[in-house]
Curated annotation (Swiss-Prot):
Designated name of the protein: Arylsulfatase G
Gene Ontology MF terms: arylsulfatase activity; metal ion binding
Biological role: Displays arylsulfatase activity with pseudosubstrates at acidic pH, such as p-nitrocatechol sulfate. Catalyzes the hydrolysis of the 3-sulfate groups of the N-sulfo-D-glucosamine 3-O-sulfate units of heparin.
Organism: Canis lupus familiaris (Dog)
EC number from the UniProt entry: 3.1.6.1, 3.1.6.15
Annotated binding of substrate, by residue: K137, S162, H251
Catalyses which reaction(s): an aryl sulfate + H2O = a phenol + sulfate + H(+); Hydrolysis of the 3-sulfate groups of the N-sulfo-D-glucosamine 3-O-sulfate units of heparin
Cofactor detail note: Binds 1 Ca(2+) ion per subunit.
Cofactor: Ca(2+)
Length: 535
């Protein structure tokens, strides 16, 4: 353990250690009525068509559909990348991966994480007097100062990366199936590269591993319980709060829960959707009972469905990427086709966000940072540029204008990680590179470069089936604008205060509560309750 981490650990625990589990709920002069609370819920691998309010074929999201009817639904809302870590880094920084340094996923053995000179949303709100909590999937570094407790979150409860990145005793549904954790002295090996069998999946509460391996069957219940506790105690304290939830749903493995047993005859994915919907419903109910008029709830997703998981993957709705499917491969997660980054999104704030409104504004996960900061009355860092915009006027029904331009970074299917080779301009979308991710049948679409680019008009072709004729007046009118926009953003990034993530790996940073066991197995230490708030 390096001296830097020891110093950060000492300072963090000294500052927070007077109350376990590291949350100071004591009043600090702020009252809840002065500033709004924020609950941001991020689903994992959820398709645009998985939300019933978006797609009539989906019948498993009653609570989310109710939230859509009681708030605002966004139909042209996009993840900042088409894979886990980059999308989450952009949510917390308001910056694309070429600026914040996170262009692809971190591993179990990753030494680094979201670069330390990047300012997170939680850090800005902490400075503004908020109590901050993060529950669920982090996936932005877990070693040393990259842990959520050192990135602005007073409280953390969750898995530090995707819940398929470690073995469990209850593996759940996956494609292909993965083995359970070993119980003896010998590791259980799998020939499948997507199965992690060496180390059990850890569950953290703040800096401590409280369960390894995680019991996936009860994980949703624990997340709901901790979220409800956090909202309760933060509300009682008189301080405004930020709760960021990174759900395990709908990423594989899909757990074999009691709900799954009740819904016999239903597909596992549908049962998982209902469990996720129930979890979100519990959190919304708690908000409604505790701080309804002063809490803004934002629900969205990190990227589109993971098509290679076949029947365990979600629905892209009408965004089928037909041009790419004809070339081979999947046009969903890891790609820059609409199915990879167009995600469900809902906003709920009684009395502030209008009821039962569908917004067509072009918005992004990038906008969460500047919007929340503005609503909190805080200030953006002045030493860097941001790619998100303050969407308050859209949220309050005063405008339908979002981005004119949006960039979709390469996310693994084709091109260099993080590179900006897909550009949205109004209803037009230009591809300088294309490629399909691995599909259910194992097919992968080959990488193709296009200069001049493929350009689609999404107003007439949401399926991205037929690109504009390069000789047409419409194409020739759009092309120079796309080229100018792309050149401008690259020039801006070159002159910006950018970061570079450390992607080196070392087995010594693997989370392990019992190095004497082949899979790091240990008994749960028991759950802690939040402090009473007495000072």
């Amino acid at each position: 353990m390096g001296w830097l981490f020891l110093k950060v650990l000492f300072l963090g625990v000294t500052f927070l250690g007077c109350l376990y589990p590291l949350v100071d709920f004591c009043p600090s002069g702020e009252t809840r009525g002065q500033k709004p609370n924020f609950v941001i819920i991020l689903a994992d691998d959820m398709g645009w068509g998985d939300l019933g309010a978006n797609w009539a074929e989906t019948k498993d999201t009653a609570n989310l559909d109710k939230m859509a009817a009681e708030g605002m639904r966004f139909v042209d809302f996009h993840a900042a990348a088409s894979t886990c870590s980059p999308s989450r880094a952009s949510l917390l920084t308001g910056r694309l991966g070429l600026r914040n340094g996170v262009t692809h996923n971190f591993a179990v053995t990753s030494v680094g994480g979201l670069p330390l000179n990047e300012t997170t949303l939680a850090e800005v709100l902490q400075q503004a007097g908020y109590v901050t909590g993060m529950i669920g999937k982090w996936h932005l570094g877990h070693h040393g100062p990259y842990h959520p407790n050192f990135r602005g979150f007073d409280y953390y409860f969750g898995i530090p990366y995707s819940h398929d990145m470690g073995c469990t005793d209850t593996p759940g549904y996956n494609h292909p199936p993965c083995p359970a954790c070993p119980r003896g002295d010998r590791p259980s090996r799998s020939l499948e590269r997507d199965c992690y069998t060496d180390v059990a999946l850890p569950l953290y509460e703040n800096l401590n591993i409280v369960e390894q391996p995680v019991n996936l069957s009860s994980l949703a219940h624990k997340y709901a319980e901790k979220a409800i506790q956090f909202i309760q105690h933060a509300s009682a304290s008189g301080r405004p709060f930020l709760l960021y939830m990174g759900l395990a749903h709908m990423h594989v493995p899909i757990s074999r829960t009691q709900l799954s047993a009740v819904l016999r005859g239903r597909r596992p994915y549908g049962a998982g959707l209902r469990e996720m919907d129930s979890l979100v419903g519990q959190i919304k109910d708690k908000v409604d009972r505790t701080a309804k008029e002063n809490t803004f709830l934002w629900f969205t997703g990190d990227n589109g469905p993971w098509a290679q998981k076949c029947e365990l993957a979600g629905s892209v709705g009408p965004f089928t990427g037909l041009w790419q499917t004809h070339q081979g491969g999947s046009p969903a997660k890891q790609t820059t086709w609409e199915g990879g980054h167009r995600v469900p999104a809902l906003a709920y704030w009684p009395g502030r966000v209008p009821v039962n409104v569908t917004s067509t504004a072009l918005l992004s996960v990038l906008d969460i940072f500047p919007t929340v900061v503005a609503l909190a009355g805080a200030s953006l860092p002045q030493d860097r540029h941001f790619d998100g915009l303050d969407a308050s006027e859209v949220l309050f029904g005063w405008s339908q204008t979002g981005h004119r331009v949006l960039f979709h970074p390469n996310s693994g299917a084709a091109g260099e990680f993080g590179a900006l080779q897909t550009v949205r301009l109004g209803s037009y979308k230009a591809f300088y590179v294309s490629g399909g991710a691995k599909a259910c049948d194992g097919d992968v679409g080959r990488e193709q470069h296009h200069d001049p680019p493929l350009i689609f008009n999404l107003e007439d072709d949401v399926a991205e089936a037929v690109p504009l004729d390069r000789g047409s007046a419409e194409y020739q009118g759009v092309l120079p604008k796309v080229r100018e926009i792309l050149a401008d953003v690259l020039l801006d990034i070159a002159g910006d205060n950018t970061s570079r993530a450390d992607y080196t790996r070392h087995p010594s940073v693997t989370p392990c509560c019992n190095p004497h066991h082949v899979a790091c197995r240990c008994q749960a230490t028991g759950w802690t309750d939040f402090p009473t708030g007495r000072c």
